[in-house]
Regions:
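Catalytic Tyr-X3-Lys loop
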Residues: 66, 74, 87-109, 129, ...
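C-terminal substrate-recognition "lid" of short-chain dehydrogenase/reductases
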Residues: 202-229, 234
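Canonical Rossmann dinucleotide-binding motif of NAD(H)/NADP(H)-dependent dehydrogenases/reductases
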Residues: 1-15
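The beta1-alpha1 cofactor-binding region of Rossmann-like NAD(H)/NADP(H)-dependent oxidoreductases
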Residues: 21-22, 42-54, 94, 208
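Catalytic loop of short-chain dehydrogenase/reductase
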Residues: 88-96, 129-151, 156-165, 178
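Active-site loop of short-chain dehydrogenase/reductase
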Residues: 9, 36-37, 64-65, 119-133, ...
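Conserved mid-core segment of classical short-chain dehydrogenase/reductases
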Residues: 75-98, 121, 141-144, 184-186
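A short, exposed helix-loop element centered on a Lys and neighboring polar residues
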Residues: 112-113, 157
Length: 235
């Protein structure tokens, strides 16, 4: 939502996709209040037919797609193999693996493919931005998530090479620890330890990721790169 509001404040017309109609309506109104336009669309981005239909609906309402921000994502954290007292007690299930891959990787591919299709069909230039994560470098307990986030970063670079001839740019952003609702629910001592590991000594704000999105959108010569927004965590 923070990314949408940053763009709305610049007057953007926003098509918002989610599974929750109530949250979509709320976000759309906030975008309008911020100075832009907003309309919500319910769709499961892991399903090809739903992605194709929702982009058709967006074209019908807005005429064209100029920017796609691939931000949908879930986590199903688990060790690949968990061992206790020399005994294997759990393995990451195929359900845990596949659910994350379906949304975080396949969903990004489907939306990217559909957005590029519409841009080429309409003859308009555009930009596709994939939200990756610093977990793309590998993180304990996140085989599924790390694989997906590495994949979407690589896809952004691949698409930049494939789509440049159409005037379509592609890039990715890899956030570090961001003060989302999920992170804010952690114990205070855990949050303190996280911040100690960040050179800037704090977590990032969602709006700061939104500013990075706006930078990519507004920078016509920027493509094929992954911006790491992590407060210097990986220095």
């Amino acid at each position: 939502r923070a990314m949408a509001l940053v763009l709305a404040a610049k007057g953007a017309k926003l098509a918002l996709i989610d599974l929750n109609q109530e949250k979509l309506d709320e976000s759309a109104q906030l975008c309008i209040d911020a100075g832009g336009e907003g309309k919500g669309y319910v769709a499961n981005i892991a399903k090809e037919a739903e992605v194709e239909q929702v982009f058709n609906n967006i074209i019908a309402d807005f005429g064209q797609v100029d920017v796609l921000v691939n931000n949908a994502g879930i986590i199903r954290d688990s060790m690949m193999i968990k061992v206790r007292d020399g005994e294997i007690t759990k393995r990451m299930s195929m359900a845990e693996w596949q659910s994350v891959i379906d949304v975080n990787l396949t969903g990004v591919f489907l939306c990217g493919r559909e957005a590029a299709t519409k841009m080429i069909e309409k003859g308009n230039q555009g930009v596709i931005i994939n939200i990756s994560s610093i977990s793309k470098a590998g993180n304990i307990g996140q085989s599924n998530y790390s694989a997906a986030k590495a994949g979407v970063a690589a896809m952004a670079v691949t698409w930049a090479k494939e789509l440049a001839r159409f005037g379509i740019r592609s890039a990715a952003i890899a956030p570090g620890f961001i003060a989302t609702e999920m992170v804010a629910s952690m114990k205070p001592e855990v949050l303190e330890n996280i911040c100690k590991g960040v050179p800037l000594n704090r977590m990032g704000e969602p709006a700061e990721i939104g500013k990075a999105v706006a930078y990519i959108v507004e920078s016509d010569y920027f493509t094929g790169r992954v911006i790491e927004m992590d407060g210097g965590l990986r220095l």
